[in-house]
């Protein structure tokens, strides 16, 4: 019985130590601007990479609008949107990367990652209607192909908000 109690105590301490080691990082410390105008894709991705390399934690978005294109969430990183924070999708379709593995575009990608999440009281606004209208204009001007002649982007050319694939331990 004492071995069982010791094992339970050791597990509890390890779980507590893992929680204590999780740290908060402010996305603004990596150069992200909450003005709704500045394209923050690079700053947000650098922040995600840094948090991942440091063992994980929460990447905190304070109040404001953070304009972004495609970002890749990595293991042990949680995007935390405080009340009043908006992760705002760019309306420029060229700000999104078509992932070569899945051939889709998304604002937030995660592929084969673990212990990831998006939490908080903030908002994710992909601005899908505006983005779709911009894509239709690009089709009409011959910039985007429309092989089916539907005068709209096909499914692989429209960015999704969130695309997680083969991920474990996901919190939304």
Show where each model-derived region lies.
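Extracellular/periplasmic carbohydrate-active domains that bind, remodel
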Residues: 20-172
């Amino acid at each position: 019985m004492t071995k069982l109690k010791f094992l339970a105590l050791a597990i509890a301490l390890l779980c507590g130590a893992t929680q204590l080691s999780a740290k908060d990082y402010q996305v603004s410390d990596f150069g992200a601007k909450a003005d709704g105008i500045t394209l923050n894709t690079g700053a947000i991705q650098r922040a995600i990479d840094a948090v991942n390399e440091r063992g994980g934690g929460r990447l905190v978005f304070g109040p404001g609008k953070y304009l972004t294109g495609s970002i890749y969430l990595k293991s042990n990183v949680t995007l935390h949107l405080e009340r009043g924070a908006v992760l705002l999708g760019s309306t420029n379709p060229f700000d999104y990367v078509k992932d070569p593995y899945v051939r889709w575009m998304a604002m937030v990608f995660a592929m084969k990652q673990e212990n990831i999440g998006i939490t908080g009281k903030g908002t994710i606004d992909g601005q899908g209607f505006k983005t779709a209208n911009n894509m239709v204009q690009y089709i009409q001007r011959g910039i985007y192909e429309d092989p089916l002649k539907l005068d709209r982007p096909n499914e692989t050319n429209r960015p999704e908000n969130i695309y997680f694939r083969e991920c474990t331990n996901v919190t939304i």
